[in-house]
């Protein structure tokens, strides 16, 4: 990175005022108008900002586009509607509640006034106004909002007050129907929301709302119950070291976990609960239940509803899963992914259920107590699971299977275990012996993260009738749902989606039958309440409607919007689908006892009805668009969370590889879900996004046919981004329509107010004015308004606009030569700033900024990439996407930062780079070392091991390492293990490189004779120099990315680099011998002479140790005059070569390179560690920079190296770009722009006058001045 200077301190603007003292007599009164003048004087500014930079339309659109507009609109309009519902309610208790709330608000207001008066008897009106400003700006709006907030909260509590009691059977006297598993078929169409309080005149109204909200939750959140059983890992009595190789793994790393699972042999349990024994019992019961298709006493199942109950002894539970909680409820991402896979597996494979009975045959004679881990490991050389279970040829492990081939360097088994000879050992030891035997043989052991049990009723020729196969295997026969087994961090888990085969219907338009899904949830809810399953050792409860339930948590998010949507849809009785709620309304009616007309209970109150209709008429199109956008953003957030969790999991294993701790990986493996070329996981993402084409994949983790692979791995990121843009545009268009209709104007609500409020100039509506006030508050606080203000300076200053191409967002005129280099630098910088680079996909080549794809081209490329044999994206393609993603977010200040950077670059370059020259003259005075450098990882004699790991370059061994583009430096793209499970396995990483500047590159710093020859012959291949560090200065103000090893060599130990034939660079910072001689001769300080002595010692190996020594009396051994004389004599005898600049390769030694004459000098240079404690070897290319170079900078720098620090033009331009990225430099340049803007617009002050304190607080005094001061 280029030299950067510490942030220049700015002189804060100071304002002072003269206080006035008022002497008040006992009989006088206070003239508050004089004591507290209007804070924003009308004659100066009643508006957000001077020059109309921020106007009402900007503020309102910012609030509406941000999505917060829905809450502001409904907080007022729906609160007002509810006030009418309370007022005219037939239930006197309801109308009385309104009166109580109104009295409470009055009391709260009185208390507020009293409190502020007690705190300050003089300034209390100002403090009260601050409270008003948070609620619309005046007393009336404050009271209204306080009342509306109370009504909305109370209304919600009334709705959910008795929801549990309202869920029952149509015939409530037959309580056994819903609580006995043998009778669950009798609940069909009989589980309803029924008004349980017939004396409540609002009972039917609330019951309808309950059914509607429950239906909306079910359709939006897709909740279902997950039957879960777990079998904890147990260490053998002899410890984990008896089965794993503790010496190879390390005792501290060997713990029961996903990587090192174990089960205790039943013979070792000593009466304690044994997980292996329980698992065997569970598995047999489950297989029996699935093969018979009948209801079993110990694994209660039913053929119609696909319901299953696990016994308590299996640590069983029913977990309510929804798309918003699946990642938090389940402990690890592989568990969540397995459940998602099971969901889609059922959705896409089931045709109809079967009750065909199959015969279960136990294999292996009378042997039992098999190790549960046997289910997760297979041999590729036979049709057998690791122990006894048979597999058919069609199900055997192939390269298409999503298992993971065990590597002996990962899974280290105790070497003392052997499968030779007779085996009288326990079953647990037998299992591990066979695992060890596989490790020692040519066979490949394949392990699985999760497996699914399948019934082979159609395959009579197979010995066993029940198998466990990987999640990637497809089943075509008709069958009952088969649970999935998953390896967790602490146990093996069994998962079964309760009723999954019953309510998931691939043939239906919605992929699931909402009515059946509701039936399963409600039936289980009633069962859990009565819990008559104790005789079967089964018990559970389902918290469906409690205050902490998922349903209530969902209802508490955006409550007002949900209530408004429910009521307005019910008002139409679902006759139209304008708000996308017809499915919800249809389900709600089915869940009500009489399929009632939902609108009847609302229309009984005409005023309430009219108010709802008015809201719908005024705001429906905007609310619908904003709600759709918000829901999609929530889906994307869930998808991002899932993908990040998978990436984090993979990176944990990559880290072990990087640290050469492969033995700690053990049973660790990639997850079996394929990642698309754009870094997304389409098969899992579809669970969260209702808009995805779920029918495009046959089975979402299947790898059996080309068609299935294609559809399953189709990239989704660009498609989602395009959808997000479309929805965002729709919201912006609807917001624009509202703002144009309102025609808002500014006013100051009080002489004590520090803020600006809005009102409609066209509509005389107090509630609308209150909405505008709320929108103003939220709009100002969005990043959009502040960014518009900041960007105004650039867009309204001639020196910037004259040199900025607004259509292409790049420089023009005399600065256009910088565009390619700017893109290069900013793209790579955005790429480096990514915390998860893997999520943007993969690349093979660097590419070029002149050939980077547009966003549309990238989208088309991603969509077609599944048909290509290779990934066509380049690094600069992906880096551009990262940069554009930053730039497009309106709430971020990326565009402001970008223009601020461009302004800084123009400021540095103008007038012959004079400002850059001024900065460098301060930073590199005579005697200060500085250099430009490049650093790469390098080992000229790599060991066999390192050479094996380093395969990222196919270049010739003689290629200069600085010219080499590395595809996978330091595991940037993962490892050859393919931990991310990409379509294309990443290339093996280059483990030598550990530099943040790996992909920062420039032109070659010298004129390479070979490259010039190729160019003359018509070759267009351009060689770059990678690992660019920029300018490094030996100064406390310097910020450099050069390695500590390199700076130590050049700043402190240069004497160790010089030889009898290569003395250049030792004292080049002094230009020549005379300059250094003169500085020493002028010195009048003993300490300075000692410093010169130390310099000569470190630079040219002169023995100067005696110069700073003292005698026993504390006196210098050598007098001041003799020191000076000695040092001057040393300088006189120095070879002039010491003062020549050095350019060339530097490590523990150095090799000069002048004008490309020694381009292979790197072969003779010994490398240096990256840092003092690093084993990574690095090599650097260095060009020294001196004060004399700085002084020669001039307007001719583009044509003469002597005027560009002795560097090629492109490298000098790269330094200017790096300096422009420095915040301190940007601040200086921006202040210069502000001064020019002031002069151009003939303002009294440099900053812009701002009339709203909220806006001023956000902008700060560099950009704005508070109008209250004038």
Swiss-Prot record:
InterPro entries: DUF3713. It is a lipid-anchor. Transmembrane segments: none annotated. Keywords: Cell membrane, Coiled coil, Lipoprotein, Membrane, Palmitate, Signal. Residues 92-123, 175-204 form a coiled coil. Residues 942-967 are annotated as: Disordered. It is found in: Cell membrane. A lipid is attached at residue 27 (N-palmitoyl cysteine). Residues 958-967 have a biased composition (Polar residues). Disruption phenotype: Probably essential, it was not disrupted in a global transposon mutagenesis study. Residues 943-957 have a biased composition (Low complexity). Pfam families: DUF3713. GO terms for cellular component: plasma membrane. This is Uncharacterized lipoprotein MG338. It comes from Mycoplasma genitalium (strain ATCC 33530 / DSM 19775 / NCTC 10195 / G37) (Mycoplasmoides genitalium).
């Amino acid at each position: 990175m280029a030299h950067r200077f510490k942030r220049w301190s700015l002189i804060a603007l100071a304002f002072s005022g003269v206080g006035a003292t008022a002497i008040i007599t006992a009989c006088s009164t206070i003239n508050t108008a004089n004591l507290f003048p209007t804070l924003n004087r009308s004659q100066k500014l009643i508006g957000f900002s001077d020059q109309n930079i921020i106007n009402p339309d900007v503020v309102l659109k910012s609030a509406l586009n941000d999505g917060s507009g829905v809450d502001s609109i409904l907080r007022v309009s729906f609160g007002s509607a509810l006030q009418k519902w309370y007022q005219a309610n037939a239930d006197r208790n309801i109308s009385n509640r309104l009166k109580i709330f109104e009295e409470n608000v009055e009391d709260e207001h009185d208390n507020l006034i009293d409190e502020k008066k007690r705190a300050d008897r003089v300034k209390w009106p100002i403090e009260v106004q601050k409270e008003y400003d948070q609620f619309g700006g005046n007393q009336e709006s404050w009271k209204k909002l306080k009342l509306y907030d109370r009504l909305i909260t109370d209304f919600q509590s009334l709705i959910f007050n008795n929801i549990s009691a309202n869920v029952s059977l149509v015939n409530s006297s037959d309580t056994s129907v819903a609580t006995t598993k043998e009778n669950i078929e009798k609940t069909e169409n009989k589980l309803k929301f029924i008004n349980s309080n017939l004396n409540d005149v609002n009972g039917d109204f609330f019951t309808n709302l309950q059914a509607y909200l429950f239906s909306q939750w079910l359709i939006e959140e897709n909740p279902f119950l997950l039957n879960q059983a777990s079998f904890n890992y147990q260490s053998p009595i002899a410890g984990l070291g008896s089965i794993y190789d503790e010496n190879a793994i390390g005792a501290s790393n060997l713990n029961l976990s996903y990587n090192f699972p174990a089960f205790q042999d039943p013979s070792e349990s000593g009466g304690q609960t044994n997980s292996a024994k329980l698992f065997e019992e569970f598995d047999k019961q489950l297989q029996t239940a699935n093969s018979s298709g009948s209801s079993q006493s110990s694994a209660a199942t039913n053929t119609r509803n696909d319901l299953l109950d696990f016994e308590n002894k299996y640590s069983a539970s029913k977990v309510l899963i929804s798309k918003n909680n699946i990642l938090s409820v389940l402990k690890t991402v592989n568990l969540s992914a397995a459940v998602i896979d099971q969901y889609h597996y059922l959705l896409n494979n089931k045709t109809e259920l079967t009750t065909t009975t199959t015969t279960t045959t136990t294999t292996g004679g009378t042997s039992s107590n098999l190790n549960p881990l046997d289910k997760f490991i297979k041999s590729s050389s036979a049709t057998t699971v690791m122990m006894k279970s048979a597999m058919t040829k069609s199900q055997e492990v192939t390269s298409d299977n999503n298992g993971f081939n065990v590597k002996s360097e990962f899974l280290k088994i105790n070497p003392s275990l052997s499968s030779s000879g007779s085996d009288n050992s326990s079953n647990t030891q037998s299992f591990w012996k066979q695992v060890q035997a596989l490790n020692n043989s040519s066979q490949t052991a394949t392990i699985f993260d999760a497996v699914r049990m399948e019934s082979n009723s159609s395959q009579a020729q197979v010995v066993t009738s029940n198998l466990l196969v990987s999640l990637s295997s497809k089943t075509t026969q008709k069958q009952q749902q088969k649970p999935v087994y998953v390896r967790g961090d602490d146990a093996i888990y069994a998962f079964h989606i309760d009723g999954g085969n019953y309510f998931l219907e691939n043939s239906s338009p919605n992929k699931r039958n909402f009515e059946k899904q509701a039936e399963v949830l409600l039936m289980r809810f009633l069962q859990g309440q009565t819990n008559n399953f104790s005789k079967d050792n089964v018990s559970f409860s389902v918290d469906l409607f409690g205050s902490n339930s998922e349903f209530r948590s969902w209802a508490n998010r955006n409550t007002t919007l949900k209530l408004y949507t429910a009521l307005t849809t019910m008002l139409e009785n679902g006759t139209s689908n304008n708000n996308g709620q017809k499915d919800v309304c249809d389900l709600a009616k089915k869940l009500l006892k009489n399929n009632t007309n939902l609108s009847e209970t609302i229309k009984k109150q005409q005023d309430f009805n009219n108010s709802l209709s008015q809201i719908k008429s005024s705001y429906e199109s905007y609310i619908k668009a904003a709600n759709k956008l918000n829901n999609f953003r929530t889906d994307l957030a869930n998808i991002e969370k899932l993908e990040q969790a998978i990436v984090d999991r993979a990176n944990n294993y990559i880290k072990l590889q990087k640290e050469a701790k492969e033995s700690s990986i053990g049973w660790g493996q990639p997850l079996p879900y394929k990642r698309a070329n754009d870094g997304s996981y389409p098969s899992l993402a579809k669970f969260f996004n209702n808009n995805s084409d779920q029918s495009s994949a046959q089975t979402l983790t299947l790898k059996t046919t080309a068609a299935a692979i294609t559809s399953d791995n189709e990239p989704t990121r660009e498609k989602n981004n395009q959808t997000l843009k479309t929805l965002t545009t729709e919201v912006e268009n609807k917001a624009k329509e509202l703002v144009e209709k309102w025609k808002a104007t500014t006013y100051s609500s009080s002489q004590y107010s520090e803020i600006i409020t809005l009102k409609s100039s066209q509509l005389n509506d107090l509630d609308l004015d209150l909405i505008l006030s709320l929108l103003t508050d939220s709009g100002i606080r969005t990043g959009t308004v502040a960014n518009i203000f900041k960007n105004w300076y650039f867009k309204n200053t001639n020196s910037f606009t004259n040199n900025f191409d607004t259509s292409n967002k790049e420089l023009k005129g005399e600065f256009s030569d910088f565009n390619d280099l700017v893109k290069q630098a900013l793209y790579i910088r955005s790429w480096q700033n990514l915390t998860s680079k893997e999520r943007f996909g993969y690349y093979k080549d660097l590419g070029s900024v002149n050939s980077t794809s547009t966003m549309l081209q990238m989208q088309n490329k991603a969509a077609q990439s599944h048909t290509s044999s290779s990934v066509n994206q380049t690094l600069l393609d992906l880096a551009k996407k990262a940069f554009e993603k930053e730039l497009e977010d309106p709430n971020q200040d990326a565009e402001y930062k970008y223009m601020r950077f461009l302004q800084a670059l123009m400021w540095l370059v103008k007038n012959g780079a004079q400002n850059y020259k001024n900065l460098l003259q301060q930073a590199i005075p005579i005697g200060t070392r500085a250099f430009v450098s490049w650093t790469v990882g390098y080992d000229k004699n790599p060991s066999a091991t390192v050479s094996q790991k380093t395969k990222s370059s196919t270049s010739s061994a003689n290629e200069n390492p600085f010219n080499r583009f590395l595809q996978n430096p330091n595991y940037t793209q993962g490892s050859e293990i393919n931990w991310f499970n990409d379509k294309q396995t990443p290339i093996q990483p280059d483990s030598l490189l550990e530099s943040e500047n790996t992909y920062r590159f420039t032109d070659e710093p010298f004129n390479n004779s070979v490259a010039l020859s190729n160019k003359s012959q018509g070759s267009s291949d351009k060689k770059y120099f990678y690992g660019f560090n920029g300018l490094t200065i030996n100064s406390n103000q310097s910020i450099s990315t050069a390695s500590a090893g390199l700076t130590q060599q050049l700043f402190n130990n240069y004497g160790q680099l010089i030889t009898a034939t290569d003395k250049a660079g030792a004292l080049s910072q002094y230009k020549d011998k005379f300059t250094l001689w003169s500085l020493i001769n002028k010195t009048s300080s003993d300490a300075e002479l000692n410093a010169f002595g130390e310099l000569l010692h470190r630079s040219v190996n002169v023995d100067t140790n005696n110069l700073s020594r003292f005698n026993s009396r504390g006196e210098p051994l050598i007098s001041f005059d003799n020191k000076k004389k000695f040092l001057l004599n040393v300088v006189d005898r120095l070879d002039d070569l010491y003062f020549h600049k050095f350019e060339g390769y530097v490590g523990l030694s150095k090799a000069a390179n002048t004008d490309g004459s020694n381009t292979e000098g790197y072969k003779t240079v010994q490398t240096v560690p990256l840092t003092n404690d690093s084993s990574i070897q690095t090599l650097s290319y260095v060009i020294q920079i001196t004060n004399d170079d700085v002084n020669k900078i001039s307007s001719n720098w583009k044509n003469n190296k002597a005027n560009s620090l002795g560097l090629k033009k492109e490298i000098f331009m790269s330094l200017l770009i790096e300096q422009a990225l420095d915040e301190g430099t940007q601040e200086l340049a921006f202040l210069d722009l502000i001064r020019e803007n002031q002069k151009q617009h003939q303002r009294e002050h440099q900053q812009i006058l701002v009339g709203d304190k909220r806006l001023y607080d956000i902008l700060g005094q560099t950009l704005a001045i508070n109008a209250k001061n004038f």
